[in-house]
Amino acid sequence: MKSHIQSLLEQTIESFKQQGILPADFEARIQVDRTKDKSHGDLATNLAMMLTKAAGKNPRELAQLIIDNLPASNYVAKVEIAGPGFINFFIDDSALANQLQAAISDEHLGIKLPTPQTIVVDYSSPNLAKEMHVGHLRSTIIGDSVVRTLEFLGHKVIRQNHVGDWGTQFGMLLAYMEELRAQNGEQAQLELSDLETFYRAAKLRFDESAEFATRARQLVVELQSGDEYCNKLWREFNDISLSHCHEVYERLGVSLTRADVHGESAYNADLEQVVKDLDAQGLLTQSNGAKVVFQEEFRNKEGEALPVIIQKADGGYLYATTDLAAMRYRSSVLKADRVLYFVDLRQALHFQQVFSLAKLAKFVRNDMSLEHLGFGTMNGEDGRPFKTRTGGVVKLVDLLDEANTRALELVRSKNPDMDEATLAEIARVVGISAVKYADLSKNRTSDYIFSFEQMLSFEGNTAPYLLYAYTRVAGIFKRATDIDLSQAKIVLEHEKEKDLGNKLAQFGEILSRVVDKGQPHVLCGYLYELAGAFSSFYEACPVLAADNDEQKHSRLLLSQLTANTLQKGLNLLGIETLERM
């Protein structure tokens, strides 16, 4: 509905240009907003005030002119001017009912799909050779929710799990395996079953022994030179580490697969060419033996230009070099229209610099959008980064295990007579959903406090509340199995029916915000409001005990569309629904 009003206003502006009311080259950014007070209509715009200067008319006069020139629309019951020149639109109830009716049988719930694009999404991207920890949660689940929503809206999405599968940490691991094999022979391979312990032991040796550290660096060189033995061991480390990652993805209900892995090592063969091309364009500068690029717009507090280091003095490459190679690949090979990077906000300057350099060096097409969608940190209840009691990094599997244990206790307390298998399945869904939703419901750019107590509450904007809200709506149809709705029509008469209908009609514009800005919290907020609107409707408007069949059938259709929307919305967040709790 919002997009329909915007379209009417766009047509009006074109008419003004043809009439000479506005300059022929005038471009306006049309903003239409939902009203909070329904006495002011359903939608409003301040367009008249925005056009005042260009049209040379006062806002109220211009508002009336806009209304007089609006194309006819069955969706609009009336239009009014308010205050200094706001234009308020009242949506026709029967047109809204028809829109909702059509949405029930549509797999996209009546949403008008945008022009499809090819969109690369870079997310999760853990460093291999050790297990995933809580710091990987946000990129993984925020990215996956946006990916799901993009695909639902018809875009071609290419997932890119840009894992850290290359670098000095592998030299350290290779050196440690070499030592173990010298001591224990092939039995040393068993040590890899616990990769985290293996990594910590190797790191300890690296920090304590200069000789070991030297050997580790030598092995990195051998690995990069294609040494067969080093490459074989490297593949084993990666395979074990990726297996750990995909066990976590499966538990989280994340859609990444092995086929989506395109890590740092995939660009090794391209790095030398990146350096040559930057040099050929005269962009490279020598600084303390390293090859760097200075860009005038990036300076420190002292006003000194900040470098992008492309190649170290020892010949090694850095993240920037790999990122530039990846951007070129995503532009020239994957033909991306947009590339979204779900990476910690602390990397903002890095991405600003490499995005700018990629455009400057023409590594990417001018029409390709590069977007860093950064996120804040997950903190403990003390407000500091989330750690174990001993100050260590919290493994993601340990966090999920605790969520499952707490959810099982909660579900059992509410269902003491339920069988263990059903309890376990409900607890699995509730536990994982609680962790994911607690994160996704927060503004992506904000830090947030991780609290099991809050996220497992059945009150407020939480996963348990929404899962229960869905079962409550779906439960109506368990009591209405013999009712034929094939000929039923939605009729909006009661104020709470209209409120619910208006909320349902907003689903498409909410999803547009999710994919345009990478903000799943907007969808979470909408689903919470939708559940509240249904609750108010259900209390005020008897469904199965309605006054007549026409009213009952209409309210059942509204309930069905609510259930469909809640389920689809939760699924787009990567959250399973339950039929009972």
Swiss-Prot record:
The lineage of its organism: Bacteria, Pseudomonadati, Pseudomonadota, Gammaproteobacteria, Alteromonadales. HAMAP family: Arg_tRNA_synth. InterPro entries: aa-tRNA-synth_I_CS, Arg-tRNA-ligase, Arg-tRNA-synth_N, Arg-tRNA-synth_N_sf, ArgRS_core, DALR_anticod-bd, Rossmann-like_a/b/a_fold, tRNAsynth_Ia_anticodon-bd. Its main location: cytoplasm. It comes from the Bacteria. It is an enzyme of class 6 (ligase). SUPFAM superfamilies: Anticodon-binding domain of a subclass of class I aminoacyl-tRNA synthetases (SSF47323), Arginyl-tRNA synthetase (ArgRS), N-terminal 'additional' domain (SSF55190), Nucleotidylyl transferase (SSF52374). This is Arginine--tRNA ligase. Gene3D superfamilies: Arginyl tRNA synthetase N-terminal domain, HUPs, Isoleucyl-tRNA Synthetase, Domain 1. One of its GO terms (molecular function) is ATP binding.
